[in-house]
Amino acid sequence: MISGWLHTVPGSTKVYDSSGNVIPLVGINVDGLDFGTGNPATSPDPCGRGWGIPTTSFANVSKWGFNFIRIPISWGNLEPTAPTLLANGTWTHHWNTQYLKELDTVTYQFGRTHIGIIYDFAQVDVSAAFQQAPEKEQGGECEGWGNPIWLYPNITSPTTVPQMTAALCNFFNDRSEVGNKAPAPIEAMEAAEQMLAARYATNSTVIGIDMFNEPWSDSTCGSPTAVGNLFTGYYTKMGQAIAQVNQHLLLVFEEPPPGLMTSSPVMTSPPAVANAIYSFHIYTADWASAQPYVQAYLHNAKSWGVPVWMGEFNAFEAGCTGANCKLDSNWQTDTQSLLNFCNTNGINWAYFSYYSLGTTVQTPVPHNQILALLQGEIPP
């Protein structure tokens, strides 16, 4: 359980509570609030999507022995309507009050059992504006999710990879695709993340914000190092904006996952913010292919003096919920090796996701087998 704010210490790879105790973060992702175009699942959009969360998770996460959760949300759900420019030159934002009330409920429910929450600003295929995209893990999605549709008025369906690459490159370069009809994209997203951080500035259940899920681009945006520098600049700007309204939060900055770019890691320095946590995701075929990446991320974390967190993994496809699952035949041994390495080296972790543990969604391996393995790896 987690009670109260957490923090980092410059030069240390640990996370601490207010009493100075080291707190290993071991948890799971509870997703579902990232889907849709501002609408709840009870009123699905044309792709059948909408936001919602499995309510059984409120009790199960604590009962299973985890101490925190990562909850993917989306800027598109927070702000489905574009901001309005006032006569005085300032922007008025139109936040989704129904969605915010749902986040309040979720925060309250997990807070009752002392489960810390890191809200993740998720994206897959950039935005719901990008439809029928060739998404790499799940074999294609009717629509993406993440950034709001109004950022991308000129996207047509079916979406192509070059369109998504250009959109992400423009985003991290703070180049607008809507002209003066909205703030520059990073500034617009800053407003959303600041709003959420301020909303929970006195609520210690919300322990952090994951500032951008799985950033990526390709050579059209520059060399891997140049793209990594763009990411560092973005995280610095976003983290400083969040800290202006809430200095308690852990600020998570992610590398691109292996496979989304030709190389990973690409970052050569951390963002210039306090309470930063370095994060990576692992969706490789097995432990042998994962280990070089994990070691590289760990090396960076130690060099920079920041904690490191494996923010997503699915036990080498044991928990895959998509159409093209490729289960590692040695998934148990490989997952144990992965988590043993993490625990031995102080790498925090969060399994993805609750849907393959506490719902009826089909997975290649029975849910109880996955859960038992994860529980066996929770540090005492």
Task: Name the predicted role of every residue range.
Residues 26, 287, 291-380:
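Substrate-binding cleft of secreted/luminal carbohydrate-active enzymes
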Residues 115, 204, 249-250, 274-276, ...:
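A structural micro-motif
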Residues 5-250, 255-265:
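Active-site mouth of glycoside hydrolases
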Residues 257-260, 283-286, 315:
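Short, catalytically relevant binding-site loops at active-site mouths
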Residues 58, 107, 239, 266-268, ...:
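Short amphipathic alpha-helical segments and helix-helix/interface helices
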Residues 207, 265-289, 307:
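Aromatic- and acid-rich polysaccharide-binding/catalytic face
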Residues 25-50, 277-279, 301, 357-373:
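Glycan-binding loop/region signatures in secreted carbohydrate-active enzymes
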Residues 118, 252, 277-279, 309, ...:
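Structural detector of well-ordered beta-strand residues that form the stable sheet scaffold
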